[in-house]
Amino acid sequence: MKPDQQVLGSIPRFNPIHKILGMMLALPLILVSQGVPAAAGDLDPDRVKRGKYVVNSAGCHDCHTPWIMKDDGPGPDMSRMLSGHPESLVMPPPPKVEAPWVWIGAGSNTAFAGPWGISFTKNLTPDPTGLGSWTEEDFINAIRLGKSKGNGRPIMPPMPWRVYRNLSDDDLKAVFAYLRSIPPIKNTPPSYQAPAAP
């Protein structure tokens, strides 16, 4: 018997199978400690239900779900629920905004122009083009601090993060759980465009 295979009771030490099993058992703990998002099936149904209530009450669909004209007037296109500004909808330059007007919005209700530049609503679905790589902590920090994940750029108007940052931790966790539970939609909205130099 080789020195690295000494017997401890009846279990050989450093057996390759045991190494593999040990790594497989440790992987979930490592991923949780690294902040990897939970799978939708791991979500608490009561928390998801609460999150849906907050999302619907806070008006998230008003901007993050593209609007279309319906028989009874404009409304959210729920087939693209919370997927942000459609990547296929290329916006022309916005018309000039003159005082006392401050900002304008696109008919889709997903693109807005004002003194801050042009902002496009984010995909909030769990797709990789949306919040797929976000952790609960990333989401809460974005809402509390008004900073986009990754580049730390300020979240632009009209996103009312200054209002939403007053939600409780439990409510923000519930919103994130709900967003993790909805169908992923592949859609990469355009990036924010800073205002043109005068």
Segments (PLM) and residue ranges:
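N-terminal secretory signal peptides that target proteins for export/translocation
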Residues: 1-18
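Bacterial N-terminal signal peptides
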Residues: 21-32
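Electrostatic cytochrome c docking/interface patches
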Residues: 36-56, 68-70, 133
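Surface-exposed patches in mature extracellular/periplasmic domains of secreted proteins
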Residues: 62-67, 152-156, 186-193
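Gly/Gly-Pro-rich "capping" loops immediately C-terminal to redox-active cysteine motifs
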Residues: 69-141, 155-168, 197-198
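C-terminal capping alpha-helices of c-type cytochrome domains
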Residues: 133-148, 161-190
